[in-house]
Design a protein with these regions (language model features):
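Outer-membrane pore/translocation modules
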Residues: 1-20, 30-155, 159
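Disulfide-stabilized cysteine-rich extracellular repeat microdomains
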Residues: 46, 170-171
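Conserved small/polar residues in nucleotide/adenosyl-binding loops
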Residues: 164-169
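Predominantly the C-terminal beta-signal and adjacent terminal strand-loop region
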Residues: 173-175
Length: 175
């Protein structure tokens, strides 16, 4: 599928002002090459913005990662590729699900990585882990990268609480 969508990017709060943003026209698509292989893409063109007064300069000695948002917003205001991610999905064992992905994973980083999810059938919980090798994208959000790269990962626990209520007004529980 593909679709054309309106898009609003924003930076809310800060010393430069309360709201900075841009209105964009975006193209989103998903190509399904096989039952378990997809390519997600998202690109957009800027229509109007108010980024001229946005500064938010950081003087931190730590690597500037998310604090570089101003550069990403300003240098990608005409055209940007937000995402272009090739993913493969697997079910290697019962109750075990996996995904591997590579590409431009989000507006600031691209890379390669994977996720595993253990979700027992008829249970309301799951346990997952993911690891990614990522590199910081160029500020214009096109095809280039900067020098900064790192490995990141997460462990996730999910619990779906289905509320049960009885006739007693104060009897509400998770089941």
């Amino acid at each position: 599928y593909w679709r054309i969508v309106p898009n609003l990017r924003s930076q809310i709060g800060g010393p430069d002002g309360f709201f900075f943003g841009d209105l964009r026209v975006g193209l989103k698509s998903e190509l399904i090459f096989a039952r378990n292989i997809t390519l997600l893409s998202s690109a957009s063109v800027g229509v109007v913005d108010n980024y001229d007064e946005l500064k938010l300069a950081s003087d931190s000695v730590l690597p500037h990662v998310r604090t570089e948002i101003v550069n990403y917003l300003k240098e990608s205001k005409k055209f940007s590729i937000e995402r272009m991610q090739l993913s493969a999905f697997y079910n290697p064992l019962p109750n075990l699900y996996a995904k591997t992905s590579a590409g431009y994973l989000e507006s600031m980083f691209g890379g390669i990585g994977g996720e595993m999810l253990y979700k027992p059938f008829y249970k309301n919980w799951s346990l997952g882990a993911e690891i990614w090798r990522v590199k910081q994208r160029e500020y214009n959000m096109r095809l280039g990268f900067q020098d900064y790269q790192t490995t990141t990962g997460f462990i996730n626990f999910n619990y779906l609480c289905l509320l049960y209520t009885s006739d007693a007004a104060d009897d509400v529980r998770c089941v």
